[in-house]
């Protein structure tokens, strides 16, 4: 379960970076060259999704919970926004949903 969770976090980080770099280019007038590492990051994101040991629909559903938590960590660390009780509560609920889905893999 720990390996799967870490793989989910790595997958989410690649997706967030792959989307953040074009955002910097479009919203903050950053270099267009950021699109190159963004494309690489998104390709890595897709490849990482293929490493998960379950049906794709289950992967995407469980991944959503980890993505929420990773995005909130990004909000805190990169954007410098203090997380609220609502952020923490939502992340906990999303992560619980992910854990329930992952725990059910192979049991059906």
UniProtKB/Swiss-Prot annotation:
The chain crosses the membrane at residues 6-26, 31-51, 61-81, 85-105. It is a multi-pass membrane protein. InterPro entries: UPF0060 (IPR003844). It holds the Pfam family UPF0060. Signal peptide: none annotated. Residues 1-5, 52-60, 106-108 are periplasmic. Keywords: Cell inner membrane, Cell membrane, Membrane, Transmembrane, Transmembrane helix. Residues 27-30, 82-84 are cytoplasmic. It comes from the Bacteria. It is found in: Cell inner membrane. GO terms for cellular component: plasma membrane. PANTHER family: UPF0060 MEMBRANE PROTEIN YNFA. Belongs to the UPF0060 family. This is UPF0060 membrane protein YnfA. It comes from Shigella dysenteriae serotype 1 (strain Sd197). The lineage of its organism: Bacteria, Pseudomonadati, Pseudomonadota, Gammaproteobacteria, Enterobacterales. The gene is ynfA.
